[in-house]
């Protein structure tokens, strides 16, 4: 970054981090109790730590943060927006190669109910990375009946992605990571329904902030500002972030999602061996 107003020929070099670290910083997450979610092609759950933590099984990643004396912890799913795109391309045809728009699909999902009328979706369409490091993992719809329609399945896909994020959080809790607020980003954060599902499953407020839509690019701009002395530290850089949306947990559906999440968490341990067997080349002939 060239520092305008600085000595000629002097360049400021900003030390940042990988894509997720920068995106988390761009969402304003550096304090305890804050979680950051990214719903892009994959799904990310991230938080800041005051101290480095051991991660013996390697299912989470812990490394340096943008903020001084902070650490970054995250879990990454391979399936988020990619799962919705799979559903759209394969089951939402209209005519002449056209598909329902994502907005139309979400409208149908909104018309369904919390818990998708008793339908659960394991979103492991591309294998999985966290919380189950299993390249042979496969997706599944559990509880499908003749009464379920397009909107119910769409909602179960959206809920399954959020259940996967909440599954990651169960790995973070032993590290002392709390959840008071989620700061959402990524294309999926544009969906009011997807933000509300996060609030309901996690049981905490979900906000989006100005700049989060630009993701890592916005975070990189903040890092550049730090390098050029626009702000003295990371905390100062994010203190004026403005919330542009807020979703509160709906207590009326809290029990529905609590039970659904427990059922969701029970599925992979039971189905994992079968899903692995189904990845055998014999079924690809």
Give the location of each predicted region.
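Active-site core segments that coordinate phosphate-bearing ligands/cofactors
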Residues: 2-285
């Amino acid at each position: 970054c060239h520092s305008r107003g600085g000595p000629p020929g002097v360049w400021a070099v900003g030390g940042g981090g990988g894509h997720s670290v920068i995106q988390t910083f761009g969402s304003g997450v550096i304090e305890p109790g804050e979680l950051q979610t990214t719903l892009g092609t994959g799904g990310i759950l991230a938080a800041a730590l005051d101290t480095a933590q051991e991660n013996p099984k390697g299912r989470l990643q812990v490394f340096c943060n943008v903020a001084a004396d902070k650490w970054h912890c995250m879990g990454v799913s391979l399936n988020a927006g990619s799962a919705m795109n799979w559903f759209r391309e394969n089951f939402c045809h209209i005519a002449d190669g056209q598909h329902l728009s994502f907005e139309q699909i979400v409208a149908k999902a909104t018309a369904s109910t919390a818990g998708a009328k008793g339908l659960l979706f394991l979103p492991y369409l591309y294998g999985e990375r966290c919380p189950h490091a299993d390249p042979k993992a496969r997706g599944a719809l559990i509880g499908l009946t003749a009464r379920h329609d397009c909107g119910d399945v769409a909602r179960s896909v959206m809920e399954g992605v959020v259940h996967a994020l909440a599954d990651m959080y169960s790995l973070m809790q032993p590290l002392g990571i709390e959840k008071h607020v989620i700061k959402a980003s990524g294309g999926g954060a544009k969906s009011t329904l997807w933000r509300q599902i996060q609030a309901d499953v996690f049981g905490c407020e979900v906000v989006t902030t100005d700049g989060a839509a630009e993701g890592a690019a916005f975070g990189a701009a903040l890092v550049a500002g730090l390098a050029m002395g626009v702000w003295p530290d990371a905390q100062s850089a994010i203190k004026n972030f403005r919330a542009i949306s807020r979703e509160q947990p709906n207590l009326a559906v809290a029990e529905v999602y609590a039970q659904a999440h427990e059922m969701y968490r029970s599925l992979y341990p039971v189905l994992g061996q079968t899903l692995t067997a189904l990845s055998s080349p014999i079924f690809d002939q």
